[in-house]
Amino acid sequence: MEIATDKVGEVIVLAREMVQDSPAAEAELRGLVAAMDEDERAELLALLWVGRGDFEPEEWDEALEAAAEEPLSTLLDSQHVADHLEAGLELVGRSARDAED
């Protein structure tokens, strides 16, 4: 996985703020994700899917390939984005706590 853990952590924090009806957090999250390159967005979505249980960590390449075909809205409109990203980080051996610090 190439995306920086701290970048995923920033997405997690903003997604949690967005759930609390923060229009500013939503705008910042959309801007952050839109500024990512295609590979980072695909990795973020693949990570969400691993955390949600759609793919196993061992299926990372398949998840990444599928994520590359999905629009940005698939990530931003997903329920429980923060929880799934946090779980995905743990499943691929990265620390979500370190990402949020």
Give short role names for the model-derived ranges.
Residues 17, 24-28, 34, 81, ...:
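Polar alpha-helical coiled-coil and adjacent low-complexity
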Residues 32, 50-54, 72, 76:
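Generic amphipathic alpha-helical segments used as scaffolds and interaction surfaces in large
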Residues 32-42, 76-80:
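Structural motif
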Residues 41-52:
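Short, hydrophobic/amphipathic alpha-helical patches that form generic packing surfaces
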Residues 55-66:
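Short, surface-exposed beta-strand/strand-loop-strand elements in extracellular ectodomains
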Residues 67-101:
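Helix-rich interaction surfaces within compact, conserved domain-sized segments
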